[in-house]
């Protein structure tokens, strides 16, 4: 699908369709008022007859409106004008895309980007419209033999901006939006892929392909089990012992900052391509969704793709910690004591608390990069789902400025996170009689004790942890990966690169 921006009055648009907003109760947006005036009150007359109230989600498609060059006008209900916020704006865009796609409008000029969204500028509205449009049109049908497609799918969308001065920011918004949307799609595709296809080797192949595509400043190294043994990554290795698929850690290095002393930002993604729970096996119901336990790695991959596509002036390293947790004769057991790469020992009380065992060795491994910051992304705890539900990602950090940056980026991107405390009192729950720590700390504050466990391996750098157990995928009828938190991390890196959308 093609996107562009232009600046022009609605009556001069010659297109298959013009899209404008209507507020409650039957109140035309400024652009709709212009069209109504040119059409001698045609639109307002329809509203007076009760054709459209302007409630959110309502639509009315008009054909051959008098004195209008475009074939059709699509009126979209936007709710009450004063209540139009970021979330509702994106819902309006989503409804617009679905309606255009369903009605065979192959191209359209959209004036919804001129609606007032409190605290958000033209760049934000155009970029969010692009991201929302791509999200709305996403489908995962690679493995289906019969693929359903619209007879006349939407192919071109033009976003109108109020003045020519805003064309540059609009074009940049499209560029950024497309790169982020492509990263989200890549993450969703990886997450939705079945575990008999998407194993650690598959993740490694995708990482290598990324380096091939962006060979100018991306290199990928894949570390296998033999090298992990030499490095002392015994906790990581233990988790994969029960699987016939080799554990592989893919390290994607992007260099965009020419300064020799520029330190990298490191992103670490938990990549459990299937988590049966191991010896502490999970219930059968819903176990199919444990293919999504690699969504952290999928998100990191998507972000690295965005960074490479936009050629951001940063150094960024993405680590995909690929592994599979299965029961078997070689599987690790409750009661085992593991010596991690850091030298600290861990008593295994539950083999289904495996993500932190993989991550702790990776968090030690990345010390060698002398990072400016490290952010790990993991579907880590069901406790985070209980705490924050399926709408907000859990955030923990040992560095207040980094946490504030991530929260700000999450708000701007519409990919929200909420900070949970890493209070010392929770560390006591990880005490073990037989090792330096246990791998679980009981039910109370389970998301926080998992973060406390990881914090013991991150003392040499600024670190943040994103628990995406509740936000990485949806269940039920809309089942599928969400691609979160690609948007959050993309905004964080755009901010670091100086593109904060305040132009």
Swiss-Prot record:
InterPro entries: Leucine_aapep/pepB, Macro_dom-like, Peptidase_M17_C, Peptidase_M17_leu_NH2_pept, Peptidase_M17_N. Mn(2+) 1 binds at residues 275, 352, 354. PROSITE patterns: CYTOSOL_AP. Its EC number is 3.4.11.1, 3.4.11.10. Its cofactor is Mn(2+). This is Probable cytosol aminopeptidase. GO terms for molecular function: manganese ion binding; metalloaminopeptidase activity. Mn(2+) 2 binds at residues 270, 275, 293, 354. It is an enzyme of class 3 (hydrolase). GO terms for cellular component: cytoplasm. The active site is at 282, 356. It is found in: Cytoplasm. Binds 2 manganese ions per subunit. Keywords: Aminopeptidase, Cytoplasm, Hydrolase, Manganese, Metal-binding, Protease. GO terms for biological process: proteolysis.
């Amino acid at each position: 699908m093609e996107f562009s921006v232009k600046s022009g009055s609605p009556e001069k648009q010659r297109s298959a369709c013009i899209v404008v907003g209507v507020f409650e109760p039957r109140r035309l947006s400024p652009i709709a008022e212009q069209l109504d005036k040119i059409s001698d009150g045609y639109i307002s007359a329809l509203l007076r007859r009760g054709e459209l109230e302007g409630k959110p989600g309502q639509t009315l498609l008009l054909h051959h409106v008098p004195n209008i060059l475009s074939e059709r006008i699509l009126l979209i209900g936007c709710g009450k004008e004063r209540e139009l916020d970021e979330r509702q704006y994106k819902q309006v865009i989503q409804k617009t895309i679905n309606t255009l796609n369903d009605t065979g409008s192959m191209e359209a000029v959209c004036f919804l980007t001129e609606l007032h969204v409190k605290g958000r500028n033209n760049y934000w509205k155009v970029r969010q419209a692009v991201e929302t449009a791509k999200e709305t049109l996403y489908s995962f049908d690679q493995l289906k033999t019969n693929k359903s497609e619209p007879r006349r799918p939407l192919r071109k969308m033009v976003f109108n901006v109020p003045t020519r001065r805003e064309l540059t920011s609009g074009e940049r918004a499209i560029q950024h939006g497309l790169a982020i949307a492509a990263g989200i799609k890549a993450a969703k595709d990886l997450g939705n892929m079945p575990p008999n296809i998407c194993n650690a080797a598959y993740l490694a192949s995708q990482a290598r392909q990324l380096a091939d595509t962006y060979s100018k400043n991306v290199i990928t190294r894949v570390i296998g089990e033999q090298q992990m043994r030499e490095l002392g990554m015994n906790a990581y290795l233990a988790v994969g012992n029960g699987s016939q698929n080799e554990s592989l850690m893919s390290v994607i290095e992007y260099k965009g900052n020419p300064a020799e002393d520029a330190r990298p930002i490191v992103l670490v993604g938990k990549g459990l391509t299937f988590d049966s729970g191991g010896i502490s096996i999970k219930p059968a119901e819903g176990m199919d969704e444990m293919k999504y336990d690699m969504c952290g790695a999928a998100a990191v991959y998507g972000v690295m793709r965005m960074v490479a596509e936009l050629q951001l002036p940063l150094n960024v390293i993405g680590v995909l910690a690929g592994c599979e947790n299965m029961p078997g004769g070689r599987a690790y057991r409750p009661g085992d004591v593991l010596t991690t790469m850091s030298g600290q020992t861990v008593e295994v009380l539950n083999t289904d608390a495996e993500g932190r065992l993989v991550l702790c060795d990776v968090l030690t491994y990345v010390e060698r990069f002398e990072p400016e910051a490290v952010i790990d992304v993991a579907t880590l705890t069901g406790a985070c789902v209980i705490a924050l539900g399926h709408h907000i990602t859990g955030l923990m950090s040992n560095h207040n400025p980094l946490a504030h940056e991530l929260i700000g980026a999450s708000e701007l991107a519409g990919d929200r996170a909420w900070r949970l405390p890493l209070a010392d009192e929770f560390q006591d729950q990880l005490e073990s009689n037989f090792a330096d720590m246990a791998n679980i700390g009981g039910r109370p504050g389970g998301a926080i004790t998992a973060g406390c466990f990881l914090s013991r391996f991150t003392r040499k750098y600024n670190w943040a942890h994103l628990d995406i157990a509740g936000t990485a995928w949806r269940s039920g009828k809309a089942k599928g990966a969400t691609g979160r938190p690609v948007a959050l991390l993309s905004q964080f890196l755009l901010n670091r690169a100086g593109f904060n959308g305040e132009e």
